[in-house]
């Protein structure tokens, strides 16, 4: 180690003439990784070696070393081309990420539209638009028309685009439609290459155009080869367009009378470079969903009327749009959407200032399936008054009354309804045909008790099948009977009695049918009771086999009526560090968490005790000094190793450049560290092994630290990133055999943000890793967590268990892998992460359960029961849904549900014992 100490720790930072290869690795494992490499290198140049000098600035190489490079300020056109290429790479990356989780992509997807916009911007760069005035509009579509005569794929795309434009089936501009169709026909890369090679097209471009660039122009065509490999599908029905996770959750809370069929896979909402594009995309999804409620290619619109009033709260009426649709299977659906929602959906989503009010409007939408309706009540005071329609389903539940304007609107609706019901159903009584061959309401039969004053016109229509002919009600006249009124029937009319034989025969048949129905009901009740008992026994067996060890029944804390830990309680508890105060502290953290005026300061003092770093009756001052001293000693030790690693990285860089320049005839070993003349003593071997292990971990840490929570204000400061790097280096140096695994930085970051003390953060992180290390790859802890979660779902929510049972066992709950690996750090915001971690630590210290994270995962899944079951999610849908819901969960609700699950399991286990 003496040879290392002669060099300063900052030796590797010295600026020396060196070489850097600025190119991407063409041997990436997948297209997505290749595109990632392209997007990371925004200053991409040709694949060649560039000489660097002392005047340049420092830049980290692929292995983390710092080399001196020379930077020249590009001109404005060059910068613009770089921006266009960067946006194009981002959109291609999003497309390929979507394709990696799906078998196909919707051609109307916002991701495809965003890619078309980026491609159109690249094609239009440097275009002399004044030379294209012979065409209708100077756009990329004009260039397609120019090459269509000499290029077969371009002509095919042009014909397809014209057909779509004539049918007007798309709302996007025509200069984007042809790009989308070229993607669908997998010929976009070929067409762009023809743009570059065609002399008739090149004359329309300036010399500084992107497509005329000898390198970047071809790069655009090459990049488009990846999206052309994706399988696209046309989905003209707007209801099949993908909804976001928030819309699915809102739809589940609204509730609907109709059964929602299986939904296509979800899309990932990603952030793009333009905020306006994101707003337009979200508004488009909401607008299309509202329009799809009334217009669909799978249904026929029979009737539509605006400004139809519906009683919402008591006597309050809201106006909206009502439509009657008939689907291809013969079913009819009546839908009503408030005007506020129709108007709001036509505006960008940023226009919704009050999300709560907008959500309440969504809850007022009505969807009635006519096959469930048996009665329709019509009430009208007189001919100049509005008409009220009320629908009653087979369970006797009435819908909100629909108020149609005065006039013939109610008759028009009933006529459309009667037409749509045929031939399977009909209205009873049917509508009459008047003298003008128009439908009219049936005439009520006049009664002798009628008064001279006009009464309300009340009708009750039944929906009956056409196969059975039933007698008309007594108060409705026969439309075929003569108009003259028959004499009234007197009450003293007498009829002959029925035959006793017939009466007895009918009674026996009725009794037999009733007995059969009762026996069937008895069998159903017995079967239901038996299967309920069988399910209960199976659940108890699952608890005995898999879940008995999850909770401790000796510690039953049922008193949840307590206050959170704040500054006042913390001072009182630390003033008298008794065992009772410690239990009270842990109980408060478990039930109510840590709150207060300065919550961060309270957490900074309380977390070391929660993690078990300090004993409750111990003062932390003396230990903190010891931690700090040991921490900086470890830093001095690994700085020597770091300097040697950086030096070897630079040597490897120069050696690789020399090998490429020399171009040897025969292949030699590429390991520049091997030296056959080196001694092979055990001491030297240990030193080399130490450097090799530390070098491998150092490079992995550097990559993860650079991308760790950069959206957080705390880590936008480079000094804090260096603190994170130092703490991670020190931990790995202390635990070099275990090494660094991706995800450790995610666990370390919240601790560093809270403590802002590197030595204390390292000690707490070491204790946290003692519990989390078993869940990392190559350890059995994660498999146990997923198995226990599966067993809990089987007991708590059999419907979700049946849903995941249809999925491959190895993949069923793999979306929860990241949950348990990082204790939900990436699923929650930082503040929610603090709350969940505190409860997990408190539950472990109270010996309630060592696996509270499993119960929190159970609460996360069961909280979205309606969304998962209603949409019949598969494995891919679940991954996308929970990825979209990241940092949007109701943390307090999930914690409360998790505590309830723990308490219920404790009671069951105690009952079994």
UniProtKB/Swiss-Prot annotation:
Domain Rab-GAP TBC: 597-844
Chain's gene name: tbc-8
Role noted for this protein: Interacts with numerous Rab family members, functioning as Rab effector for some, and as GTPase activator for others. GTPase activator for rab-2. In association with ric-19 activates rab-2 during dense core vesicle maturation in cholinergic motoneurons.
Organism: Caenorhabditis elegans
Region annotation (Disordered) ranges: 1-24
Protein name: Rab GTPase-activating protein tbc-8
Compartments where found: Golgi apparatus, trans-Golgi network; Early endosome; Cytoplasmic vesicle membrane
Coiled-coil boundaries: none
A Pfam short name: RUN
Principal place of residence: Golgi
Keywords: Cytoplasmic vesicle, Endosome, Golgi apparatus, GTPase activation, Membrane
Domain RUN: 106-240
GO cellular component, one term: Golgi trans cisterna
A GO molecular function held by the record: small GTPase binding
Alphabetized PANTHER family for the sequence: SMALL G PROTEIN SIGNALING MODULATOR 2-RELATED, TBC1 DOMAIN FAMILY MEMBER GTPASE-ACTIVATING PROTEIN
GO biological process: dense core granule maturation
Subunit structure: Interacts with rab-19. Interacts with ric-19; the interaction is direct and may be required for the activation of rab-2 and dense vesicle maturation in cholinergic motoneurons. Interacts (via RUN domain) with rund-1. Does not interact with unc-108 (GTP-bound form).
Consequences of knocking out this gene: RNAi-mediated knockdown results in neuronal dense core vesicle trafficking defects whereby fewer dense core vesicles are transported to axons of the dorsal nerve cord.
Family per similarity comment: Belongs to the RUTBC family.
